[in-house]
């Protein structure tokens, strides 16, 4: 008798995706982040659902409803800390996942990559609207500054910004709709993640060497289920350490003050995971130029497959490209640091140089390195 998991219409899908899936035998821990992102999403949806049961999306009560959750709801403090720090873990895994894709040439699976970039944008949108909900000072002013960027769009900008706000400024209507967006978007992310996996399973996983692994595949279960389980344990350990020992480490002290439209905080800045893009936005002294640079800093990921010039897929055997990749990583860390600093010298010039280097590396230096490595590998006799 054939095993039920191979015949049942529903179990068959799960079987082909997580049990009898042929996987390359040499994929490293860098391939763990996809499943870790799935776990992060589930944690965020569950903690978010329970928080939504007690939260009120009204300007008068939003801030105190969050305080009420932390003080009066059973384990409400834990739910809130897990949800807030879960977002940080989510982005940590996202950045490592994207970095892995760039390093090992996974972006050559174009459909999977493009859906992944759409997923990244959707998660960023979700995190942004979610940060507004506690209605603290940084929530309010962050929402004001970022939504106000829409007004830089020629002709329709102001109308568009007021349409998003539901009035002439960030107010009750804005908070209510942001809560609605924040509730619906994770389910859209879940659907997109399924499509992401669907496209991935059309081709199978890439591997560190970048060489076609068809000749050496192993079943996903038990080999990679146990490996993923180890990843889950480490992720949960890190999340619990963060949420239980220093829950406010990555937050902004200004958000402990209720939103006040009459009092602007001295330094408006987003959460740490947006600082690199915020630094690029601020490095251009023109409003529209800054908005375009901000968009380009993320959308540039879509053209990375077109900029692949090397004969080899992975960077594993390409030392020049490797060096440029790690310079890019250091550059992004520099941008993250600059995004959190006040707008004054020397931070302005460092931010401008780092922003310029970011685009130069991706658009010019890395494709040139690929061509040079091709030339170096050609037999000279």
UniProtKB/Swiss-Prot annotation:
Keywords: Electron transport, Heme, Iron, Membrane, Metal-binding, Mitochondrion, Mitochondrion inner membrane, Respiratory chain, Transmembrane, Transmembrane helix, Transport, Ubiquinone. It is a multi-pass membrane protein. The chain crosses the membrane at residues 33-53, 77-98, 113-133, 178-198, 226-246, 288-308, 320-340, 347-367. GO terms for cellular component: mitochondrial inner membrane; respiratory chain complex III. The keyword rRNA processing does not apply. Gene3D superfamilies: Cytochrome Bc1 Complex, Chain C (1.20.810.10). Its main location: mitochondrion. Coiled coil: none annotated. Heme b b562 binds at residues 83, 182. InterPro entries: Cyt_b/b6_C (IPR005798), Cyt_b/b6_C_sf (IPR036150), Cyt_b/b6_N (IPR005797), Cytb/b6-like_sf (IPR027387), Cytochrome_b (IPR030689), Cytochrome_b_C_euk/bac (IPR048260), Cytochrome_b_N_euk/bac (IPR048259), Di-haem_cyt_TM (IPR016174). Its cofactor is heme b. It comes from the Eukaryota. GO terms for molecular function: metal ion binding; ubiquinol-cytochrome-c reductase activity. SUPFAM superfamilies: a domain/subunit of cytochrome bc1 complex (Ubiquinol-cytochrome c reductase), Transmembrane di-heme cytochromes. Heme b b566 binds at residues 97, 196. Binds 2 heme b groups non-covalently. A ubiquinone binds at residue 201. It holds the Pfam family Cytochrom_B_C. It is found in: Mitochondrion inner membrane. One of its GO terms (biological process) is mitochondrial electron transport, ubiquinol to cytochrome c. Component of the ubiquinol-cytochrome c reductase complex (complex III or cytochrome b-c1 complex) that is part of the mitochondrial respiratory chain. The b-c1 complex mediates electron transfer from ubiquinol to cytochrome c. Contributes to the generation of a proton gradient across the mitochondrial membrane that is then used for ATP synthesis. Heme 1 (or BL or b562) is low-potential and absorbs at about 562 nm, and heme 2 (or BH or b566) is high-potential and absorbs at about 566 nm. Belongs to the cytochrome b family. The cytochrome bc1 complex contains 11 subunits: 3 respiratory subunits (MT-CYB, CYC1 and UQCRFS1), 2 core proteins (UQCRC1 and UQCRC2) and 6 low-molecular weight proteins (UQCRH/QCR6, UQCRB/QCR7, UQCRQ/QCR8, UQCR10/QCR9, UQCR11/QCR10 and a cleavage product of UQCRFS1). This cytochrome bc1 complex then forms a dimer. This is Cytochrome b. The lineage of its organism: Eukaryota, Metazoa, Chordata, Craniata, Vertebrata. The gene is MT-CYB.
């Amino acid at each position: 008798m054939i095993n039920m998991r191979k015949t049942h219409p529903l179990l068959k899908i799960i079987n082909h995706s997580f049990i009898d899936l042929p996987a390359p035998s040499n994929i490293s821990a860098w391939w763990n982040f996809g499943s870790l992102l799935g776990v992060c999403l589930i944690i965020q949806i569950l903690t978010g659902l329970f928080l939504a049961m007690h939260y009120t999306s009204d300007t008068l009560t939003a801030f105190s409803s969050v305080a009420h959750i932390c003080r009066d709801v059973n384990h409400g403090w834990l739910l809130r800390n897990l949800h807030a720090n879960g977002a940080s873990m989510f982005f940590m895994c996202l950045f490592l996942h994207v970095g892995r894709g760039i390093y090992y040439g996974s972006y050559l699976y174009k459909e999977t990559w493009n859906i992944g970039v759409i997923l990244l944008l959707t998660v960023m949108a979700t995190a942004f609207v979610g940060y507004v909900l506690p209605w603290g000072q940084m929530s309010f002013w962050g929402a004001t500054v970022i939504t106000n960027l829409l007004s830089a769009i020629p002709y329709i900008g102001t109308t568009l910004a007021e349409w998003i706000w539901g009035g002439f400024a960030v107010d009750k209507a804005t908070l209510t709709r942001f809560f609605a967006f924040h509730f619906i978007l994770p389910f859209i992310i879940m659907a997109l993640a399924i499509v992401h996996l669907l496209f991935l399973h059309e081709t199978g996983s890439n591997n560190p060497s970048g060489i076609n692994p068809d000749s050496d595949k192993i079943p996903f279960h038990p080999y990679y289920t146990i490996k993923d389980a180890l990843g889950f344990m480490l992720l949960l350990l890190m999340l619990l350490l963060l949420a239980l020992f220093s829950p406010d480490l990555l937050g902004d002290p200004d958000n402990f003050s209720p939103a006040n439209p009459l009092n602007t905080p001295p330094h408006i800045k987003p959460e740490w995971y947006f600082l690199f893009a915020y630094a690029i936005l601020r490095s251009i002294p023109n409003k529209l130029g800054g908005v375009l640079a901000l968009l380009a800093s993320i959308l540039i990921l879509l053209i990375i497959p077109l900029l692949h010039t090397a004969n080899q897929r992975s960077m594993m055997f390409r030392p020049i490209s490797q060096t440029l990749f790690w310079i890019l990583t250091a550059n992004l860390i520099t941008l993250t640091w600059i995004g959190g600093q006040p707008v004054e010298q020397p931070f302005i010039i460092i931010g401008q140089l780092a922003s310029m280097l970011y685009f130069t590396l991706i658009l010019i230096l890395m494709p040139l390195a690929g061509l040079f490595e091709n030339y170096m590998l050609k037999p000279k006799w």
